[in-house]
């Protein structure tokens, strides 16, 4: 482990887990829906789980192949609130093959008064992240021999896959929506087409997952 110093406080940090395509494919095979589709959304968009759980169908434009991230589920009280910063609020590209997975899920998704993409079967609202991680994702990771697979694993995997496909740092930052003003100023704003191209390459890596989801 490495020692990380933050304003006079030292703490140990674990190296983040990065999954291979093969590991992701096996992991989602252990997950029932809707959790399997949630994980696929995370891997194919890099969205935070708080943003995924707060997704509404009205924010997804299947004609333009875009998804607007505006709100999240707050961890403290599980209520819906705006995303943390202006950098977190953005329009993201969605790949056509990934869009087909979303459309297939929409057909079998239970109807929801709140227009949720992932409405809870128990409350008619959105799901809570922690129980899903503890009851489904972490046990699935342990079957792969990985002890600490969690929601952030998929976001970190997405970032690593972006890097592996050669996506420029500025484009990565816009897709992940990090609030790093210095990096934004240094690399400039990424155009939607640049973001779409970078995202497309990651989704191509994840194609086996999408094919399994549609099987």
Task: Pin down the residues of each PLM region.
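Residue-level detector of conserved, well-ordered beta-strand and adjacent loop positions
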Residues: 5, 20, 28, 70, ...
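C-terminal secondary-structure termini that scaffold catalytic or DNA-interacting sites
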Residues: 64, 75-100, 104, 108, ...
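Residue-level signal for well-ordered alpha-helical positions
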Residues: 30, 55, 104-108, 187-190
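Short, small-residue-rich loop/turn micro-motifs
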Residues: 2-8, 71-73, 176, 191
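Basic, Lys/Arg- and aromatic-enriched nucleic-acid-binding interface segment
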Residues: 1-55, 63, 87-88, 97-100, ...
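Active-site/catalytic core of tyrosine-dependent DNA strand-transfer enzymes
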Residues: 22, 64, 73-75, 95-147
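C-terminal catalytic core of tyrosine-transesterase DNA break-rejoin enzymes
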Residues: 33, 37-40, 44-51, 131, ...
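Short, polar N-cap/turn motifs at the start of nucleic acid-interacting alpha helices
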Residues: 59-66, 147-148, 167-186, 197
């Amino acid at each position: 482990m490495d020692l990380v110093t933050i304003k006079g406080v030292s703490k140990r940090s674990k190296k983040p887990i990065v999954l291979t395509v093969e590991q992701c494919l096996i992991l989602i095979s252990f997950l029932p829906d809707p959790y399997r589709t949630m994980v696929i959304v995370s891997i194919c968009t890099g969205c935070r789980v708080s943003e995924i759980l707060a997704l509404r169908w009205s924010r997804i434009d299947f004609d333009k192949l875009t998804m607007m991230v505006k709100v999240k589920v707050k961890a403290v009280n599980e209520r819906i609130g705006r995303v943390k910063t202006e950098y977190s609020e953005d329009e993201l590209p969605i790949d056509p093959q990934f869009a087909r997975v979303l459309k297939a899920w929409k057909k079998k998704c239970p109807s929801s008064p709140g227009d949720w993409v992932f409405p809870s079967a128990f409350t008619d609202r959105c799901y809570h992240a922690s129980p899903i991680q503890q009851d489904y994702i972490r046990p699935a990771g342990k079957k792969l021999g990985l002890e600490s697979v969690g929601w952030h694993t998929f976001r970190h995997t997405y970032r690593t896959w972006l890097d592996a496909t050669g996506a420029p740092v500025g484009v990565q930052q816009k897709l992940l929506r990090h609030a790093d003003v210095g990096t934004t100023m240094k690399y400039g704003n990424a155009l939607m087409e640049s973001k779409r191209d970078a995202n497309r390459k990651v989704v191509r890596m994840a194609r086996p997952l999408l094919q399994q989801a549609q099987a």
